[in-house]
Design a protein with these regions (language model features):
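Exposed alpha-helical structural elements
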Residues: 163, 255-259, 280, 284, ...
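AAA+ P-loop NTPase catalytic core and its hallmark functional loops
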Residues: 4-271
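C-terminal engagement/docking regions of AAA+ P-loop ATPases
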Residues: 327-389
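Conserved AAA+ ATPase small/helical "lid" subdomain
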Residues: 84, 257, 263-337
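Charged, glycine/proline-rich intrinsically disordered loops and linkers
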Residues: 46-72, 282-299, 365-373
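Surface-exposed polar/charged interaction patches
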Residues: 29-33, 266, 295, 368, ...
């Protein structure tokens, strides 16, 4: 009897260590400079992996030995749109075995940056703890397989390591997402871990497993949102264990528009639909998000900021929704005509009163741009009644 293996199930999101496996293998062979203990790539190659090669095809040395299927020349994809100096500081922090804390407003790609850094440094982004109000100390340290615990008592085999403890034993990078959502007493479990680089297991006292020591290469990347509700203040002791880096919104309109286009196109194509949103619509969408986020238009006109964070990630979501509407309901309406309704839904998330601020934006910059002759903004101005709903 022949057993047929079923193909691997399709996944909505492929982890970066698999998606960029060719790039990682190429960069490991491309740069043979010094690298910190247990690092897969050199610090310089880590930065190149995150920021890309600016469209330039990198060439492997003639004597470089690479796995089959890895090309000798390769353009490294740009993955993070931001300040290169920020990424370099993050890499230096990790190389110095200091904890790294990425802070910023929601939707500024902190989690993506932490994924990319951990992937480039240790080859995996999967050793992660998601911080919530229900996160317990066990999820940062260890738990127990209670069936084995009852049968054998406290043994190393019965211990269930957390992602952090697994990273310590492997010399890898662990990630703690939204660390400030954890309760303070849970956060403080990281203090001794980051300073002493070990975890005590008192249940195994008297054995060699009573202390779990971090292998060379272990480090921790945490993220925290600055404008979120339901967060807990970090203790001064824990703050001192991290180097802080602030990840801000994308500064350039064209760069943000290109990112929104690329990310929205990818999400729509995963759904099996074509991406059919004009550049003019995307530019208007991103411009509106930037104006409302910054409290000032590109022309310098004052804008009342909503309490909702108008993040790039939210702009990608709206662009994807517009593209899906165009694909699944073709000819029903102009895609631009759907934009006001989506913006209204975004600003109402945190405070219904923000709808009035959006109408104020329409009565200000949108109207003035329409009066200056812009056809796109004229159409949007004519749709102001949508915001009265």
């Amino acid at each position: 009897m022949t057993t047929t293996l079923s193909p691997s199930p399709a996944r909505q999101i492929v982890p970066p260590e698999e998606r960029y496996a060719t790039e990682l293998a190429f960069l490991a062979a491309h740069d043979d400079g010094p690298r910190p203990p247990a690092w897969r790539l050199t610090p310089r190659a880590v930065v190149t992996f995150v920021m890309g090669s600016a469209g330039e095809a990198l060439k492997l040395p003639d004597d470089a030995d690479v796995p089959e299927g890895v090309p000798r020349r390769l353009v490294i994809e740009d993955k993070f749109v931001g300040d290169r100096a920020l990424v370099e500081r993050c890499v230096v922090t990790l190389a110095g075995e200091r904890g790294l804390l990425l802070v910023g407003e929601p939707g500024t790609a902190k989690s993506m940056l932490s994924e990319l850094l951990s992937t480039a440094v240790c080859g995996t982004s999967g050793l992660v703890v998601q911080g919530t109000a229900g996160t317990t100390e066990d999820q940062l340290k260890y738990g127990w397989n209670y069936a084995l615990l009852l049968a054998q008592g406290p043994t190393r085999q019965a211990l269930v390591p957390s992602p952090v403890l697994t990273a310590m034993s492997r010399g890898a990078v662990a990630r703690v997402e939204e660390v400030t959502r954890c309760l303070p007493e849970v956060q403080d479990a990281l203090v001794s871990l980051l300073s002493e680089r070990r975890i005590a297991v008192p249940e195994l006292a008297g054995s060699e497993d009573a202390l779990a020591h971090a292998a060379p290469g272990f480090n921790l990347i945490a993220t925290a949102n600055l404008r979120d509700k339901g967060v807990s203040e970090m203790s001064a002791a824990l703050k001192r264990r991290f180097n802080f880096e602030t990840v801000g919104p994308i500064g350039d309109l064209d760069a943000e528009t290109a990112l929104v286009r690329g990310q929205a196109r990818a999400s729509v194509e995963r759904a099996g639909a074509p991406f059919q949103v004009d550049d003019a619509v995307l530019e208007a969408l991103v411009t509106a998000f930037r104006d409302l986020r910054e409290g000032r238009s590109a022309e310098g006109w004052e804008v009342e900021r909503p309490s909702t964070v108008m993040s790039t990630a939210e702009a990608v979501s709206v662009a994807g929704a517009l593209a899906l509407a165009a694909a699944y309901f073709p000819g029903d309406r102009d895609v631009l005509g759907l934009l006001p309704g989506h913006l209204l839904g975004v600003v109402r998330k945190d405070d219904p009163a923000d709808a009035a601020r959006l109408r104020g934006y329409w009565d200000g910059p949108v109207r003035r741009r329409a009066e200056q002759g812009s056809a796109t903004w004229r159409t949007l101005w004519d749709l102001r009644t949508v915001l009265e709903g």
